[in-house]
């Protein structure tokens, strides 16, 4: 489900990837959390790639629309 949502936000003409950020669990970072703009990620099989950082899907905490502040996805 999460992979499909990210693909939709990246490729569907109704959405602009520049409007979204992904907040993910990153041990050792402030509050153990980092953010990456959706437009800068590449989807692999079971993880996202940002620069040379691999982010497993299970570490994604939320996806936020930066224009509206709406949380599109939030991990339970």
From Swiss-Prot:
Transmembrane spans: none
Family per similarity comment: Belongs to the UPF0248 family.
Source organism of this protein record: Methanococcus maripaludis (strain DSM 14266 / JCM 13030 / NBRC 101832 / S2 / LL)
InterPro entries according to UniProt: MJ1316, UPF0248
Any Pfam family matching the protein: MJ1316
Higher taxonomy: Archaea, Methanobacteriati, Methanobacteriota, Methanomada group, Methanococci
Protein name: UPF0248 protein MMP0286
């Amino acid at each position: 489900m999460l992979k499909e949502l990210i693909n939709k936000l990246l490729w569907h003409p109704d959405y602009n990837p520049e409007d979204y950020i992904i907040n993910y669990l990153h041990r050792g970072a402030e509050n153990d959390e980092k953010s990456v703009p959706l437009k800068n990620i590449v989807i692999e099989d079971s993880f996202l790639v940002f620069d040379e950082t691999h982010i497993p899907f299970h570490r994604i905490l939320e996806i936020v629309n930066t224009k509206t502040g709406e949380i599109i996805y939030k991990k339970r």
